Amino acid sequence: MKKSSTQFVVYGGLIAALYVVLTLVSQLFCLASGVIQVRLSESLCMLPCLTSAAVPGLSIGCLIANFIMGSPWQDVVFGTLATLIGAVGTWMMRKKAPQWSWIPPVLSNAIIIPIVLIYAYHVPDAWWFLVLTVGAGELIACGLIGIYVYPVAQKALGIQKVQPQ
């Protein structure tokens, strides 16, 4: 599927905006940050399978959402990095194993975010506990909710089958 640069920017911008809105909705229920978090926006992490515009879209959306929520700089920087790593991993899996493409964002967030929680939010030394709680939240958002978002997005974008990009 050949896309113009305008369409790439529009898709990326829409994904970033949707990420911000869904993160703020999650924040209304105190689920967007902290030891136990299930960001609804993370359900969009399957989108790099459908369009490479989702990689910068998700990353910019995370950056903006963390900034708007007043997160410490470590969370803004390293939370965005975790999302970028997960999005790139998902994009790399799009052809060979799209059904498993939810794994990179779960792993990147489960490994990086506990470190952020310990240093930026001064959560007591409980790295393994944080890996489990953040990983479980990511599993719910990416693995469970994301599985349902994927076909809806696929239909909305008019993609019949994942195409090499």
List the model feature ranges, each with a label.
Residues 24-35, 43, 63-165:
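Membrane-embedded alpha-helical hairpins and interfacial helices in multi-pass inner-membrane proteins
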Residues 1-49, 53-56:
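Hydrophobic transmembrane alpha-helices
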Residues 49-69:
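Membrane-helix boundary elements
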